[in-house]
């Protein structure tokens, strides 16, 4: 426990909170060609690479990912959720924050059903998370 005199001489240090998705906290001013501190919930970007990677132990799979160059000139790795996708190089995508626990370095998700990304086909439950339209009611 510090004395009052110690606190007067050297106050308490506040904890530094680090962002989980730092690329969303930067903007880009193309007129002066520099980054700005403008936060946004999602960002647009162009796929520079689409591929699969294997997760950490003890899981085993081929997880789909895309390397995305954002509008603020930062390049990030984003996870492609759902079964099947139509993304390839130069596809324009929307990313949101949210890491994938078993893929190191993947801190972002691609939003399905936005821009060039198609929704998941044949999905009936949790459709809003995968950009799937409501199926037409069957005729009797």
Curated annotation (Swiss-Prot):
InterPro entries for this protein: NA-bd_OB-fold, Ribosomal_uS12, Ribosomal_uS12_bac
GO cellular component, one term: small ribosomal subunit
GO molecular function: rRNA binding; structural constituent of ribosome; tRNA binding
Keyword terms of this UniProt record: Methylation, Ribonucleoprotein, Ribosomal protein, RNA-binding, rRNA-binding, tRNA-binding
Superkingdom of origin organism: Bacteria
Stretches the record annotates as Disordered: 1-20, 35-55, 121-140
PROSITE patterns named among the record's database cross-references: RIBOSOMAL_S12
Family annotation (SUPFAM superfamilies): Nucleic acid-binding proteins
Record's compositionally biased regions (Basic residues): 130-140
3-methylthioaspartic acid carried by residues: 102
Swiss-Prot/TrEMBL GO biological process terms: translation
Pfam families given in the database record: Ribosom_S12_S23
Role, per record: With S4 and S5 plays an important role in translational accuracy. Interacts with and stabilizes bases of the 16S rRNA that are involved in tRNA selection in the A site and with the mRNA backbone. Located at the interface of the 30S and 50S subunits, it traverses the body of the 30S subunit contacting proteins on the other side and probably holding the rRNA structure together. The combined cluster of proteins S8, S12 and S17 appears to hold together the shoulder and platform of the 30S subunit.
Oligomer status and interactors: Part of the 30S ribosomal subunit. Contacts proteins S8 and S17. May interact with IF1 in the 30S initiation complex.
Protein family membership: Belongs to the universal ribosomal protein uS12 family.
Identification of the protein by name: Small ribosomal subunit protein uS12
Gene it is expressed from: rpsL
């Amino acid at each position: 426990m510090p004395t009052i005199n110690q606190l007067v001489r050297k106050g308490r240090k506040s904890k530094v909170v680090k962002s989980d998705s730092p690329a969303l906290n930067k903007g880009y001013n193309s007129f002066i060609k520099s980054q700005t501190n403008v936060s946004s919930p999602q960002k647009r970007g162009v796929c520079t690479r689409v591929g699969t990677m294997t997760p950490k132990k003890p899981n085993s799979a081929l997880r789909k990912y895309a390397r995305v160059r954002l509008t603020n000139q930062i390049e990030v790795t984003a996870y492609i959720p759902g079964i099947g996708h139509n993304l390839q190089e130069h596809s324009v995508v929307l990313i949101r924050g949210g890491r994938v626990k078993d893929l190191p370095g993947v801190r972002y998700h691609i939003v399905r059903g936005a821009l060039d990304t198609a929704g998941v086909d044949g999905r009936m439950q949790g459709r809003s998370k995968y950009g799937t339209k409501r199926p037409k009611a069957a005729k009797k």
